[in-house]
Curated annotation (Swiss-Prot):
<comment type="subunit">
    <text>Homotrimer. Forms mixed heterotrimers with OmpF and with PhoE; other mixed heterotrimers are also probable.</text>
</comment>
<dbReference type="GO" id="GO:0042802">
    <property type="term" value="F:identical protein binding"/>
</dbReference>
<feature type="signal peptide">
    <location>
        <begin position="1"/>
        <end position="21"/>
    </location>
</feature>
<feature type="binding site">
    <location>
        <position position="355"/>
    </location>
    <ligand>
        <name>Mg(2+)</name>
    </ligand>
</feature>
<protein>
    <recommendedName>
        <fullName>Outer membrane porin C</fullName>
    </recommendedName>
</protein>
<feature type="topological domain" description="Periplasmic">
    <location>
        <begin position="287"/>
        <end position="291"/>
    </location>
</feature>
<feature type="topological domain" description="Periplasmic">
    <location>
        <begin position="64"/>
        <end position="73"/>
    </location>
</feature>
<feature type="transmembrane region" description="Beta stranded">
    <location>
        <begin position="74"/>
        <end position="84"/>
    </location>
</feature>
<feature type="transmembrane region" description="Beta stranded">
    <location>
        <begin position="270"/>
        <end position="286"/>
    </location>
</feature>
<feature type="transmembrane region" description="Beta stranded">
    <location>
        <begin position="201"/>
        <end position="207"/>
    </location>
</feature>
<feature type="transmembrane region" description="Beta stranded">
    <location>
        <begin position="54"/>
        <end position="63"/>
    </location>
</feature>
<keyword id="KW-0460">Magnesium</keyword>
<feature type="transmembrane region" description="Beta stranded">
    <location>
        <begin position="107"/>
        <end position="115"/>
    </location>
</feature>
<feature type="topological domain" description="Periplasmic">
    <location>
        <begin position="155"/>
        <end position="163"/>
    </location>
</feature>
<feature type="transmembrane region" description="Beta stranded">
    <location>
        <begin position="242"/>
        <end position="248"/>
    </location>
</feature>
<feature type="topological domain" description="Periplasmic">
    <location>
        <begin position="327"/>
        <end position="330"/>
    </location>
</feature>
<feature type="transmembrane region" description="Beta stranded">
    <location>
        <begin position="164"/>
        <end position="171"/>
    </location>
</feature>
Length: 367
């Protein structure tokens, strides 16, 4: 019986963390779910910057309220707290925080810190036990989590076509801190140039049918003045992203691949951005009925014609071999081996890019 139960619950654990939420309140059209996890995590690596304790926890809630028969309000917040630092250090941050309205088949609109629409497709390969999803990053234009997202989403194409979803998104400018020497581009939530963005727009479309999925996404963002100084490579007026992906998720098999081409949008360590980058991620997983889920993946990000003495360089390149074992819906353990294929050379040293292998061991409690 335990084997059958695990075969049903494990796929549910692989989607958004809130899928495993604990219901706190559900009455009179108002619902509140609490979710979270604690990951006792340790890295083993020759790179002393990452070797050691990486323990963290995440906590969040999802709420909704029935305004009318046709209108529903909703909100979500998620926070991460590092458990590997001293008590007098403030190593915590908000991952997402947004609120919105859903108008039945017409669609939903929300605003806040959220995921960019490019992640609607690239998330298909961001399923590894620990690593993965690092040909892009957070606060990286519209490629993953970011601030100031206004998002319209439509599911099942106005209720007419099952599995056909699309989204349109706008991101407001997140620029310089005050007092940084710039006369323009200052915003109330300023940050360093590598995590800034100008006004941006994007869209995505995905179609799922009987386990098969196909999707595409594009985004185009203005770059800030601080991003176009001589301090960084990859100057340009706009940061653009073009993404396509495929997936298969059925019969205990999960296969996914995505290819993304970017212009002035893929970060090159601490050096800046690639004028052009070609990013590829592919993953294969199989879910055994007794709770074991092995995983194999390949990820590569190649920068083209980088400039400043660099030509074409691999920004990221590794094979990932891992496995997760689910004791039940609340408890799991995993091992993830990142086999780094990058060479230690002048480029990786200048950019501060890690070239060492990493083994991650984790024990997770989630609710």
């Amino acid at each position: 019986m335990k084997v059958k139960v695990l075969s049903l619950l494990v796929p549910a654990l692989l989607v958004a963390g809130a899928a495993n939420a604990a219901e706190v309140y559900n009455k009179d059209g108002n619902k509140l779910d609490l979710y979270g996890k604690v990951d006792g995590l340790h890295y083993f690596s020759d790179n002393k910057d990452v070797d050691g304790d990486q323990t963290y926890m995440r906590l969040g809630f999802k709420g909704e309220t029935q305004v009318t028969d046709q209108l529903t309000g909703y909100g979500q917040w998620e926070y991460q707290i590092q458990g590997n630092s001293a008590e007098n250090e403030n190593n915590s941050w908000t991952r997402v925080a947004f609120a919105g309205l859903k108008f039945q088949d017409v669609g939903s609109f929300d605003y806040g810190r959220n995921y960019g629409v490019v992640y609607d497709v690239t998330s298909w390969t961001d399923v590894l036990p620990e690593f993965g999803g690092d040909t892009y990053g957070s606060d990286n234009f519209m490629q993953q989590r970011g601030n100031g997202f206004a998002t319209y989403r439509n599911t099942d194409f106005f209720g007419l076509v099952d599995g056909l979803n699309f989204a349109v998104q706008y991101q407001g400018k997140n620029g310089n801190p005050s007092g940084e020497g710039f006369t323009s581009g200052v915003t109330n939530n300023g940050r360093d140039a590598l995590r800034q963005n100008g006004d941006g727009v994007g869209g995505s479309i995905t179609y799922d049918y009987e386990g098969f999925g196909i999707g595409g996404a594009i985004s185009s963002s203005k770059r800030t003045d601080a991003q176009n100084t001589a301090a960084y490579i990859g100057n340009g007026d706009r940061a653009e992203t073009y993404t396509g992906g495929l997936k298969y998720d059925a019969n205990n098999i999960y296969l996914a691949a995505q290819y993304t081409q970017t212009y002035n949008a893929t970060r090159v360590g601490s050096l800046g951005w690639a004028n052009k980058a070609q990013n590829f991620e592919a993953v294969a997983q199989y879910q055994f009925d007794f709770g074991l889920r092995p995983s194999l993946a390949y990820l590569q990000s190649k920068g083209k014609n980088l400039g400043r003495g660099y030509d074409d360089e691999d920004i990221l390149k590794y094979v990932d071999v891992g496995a997760t074992y689910y004791f039940n819906k609340n408890m799991s353990t995993y091992v993830d081996y990142k086999i780094n294929l990058l060479d230690d050379n002048q480029f990786t040293r200048d950019a501060g890019i890690n070239t060492d292998n990493i083994v991650a061991l984790g024990l997770v409690y989630q609710f």
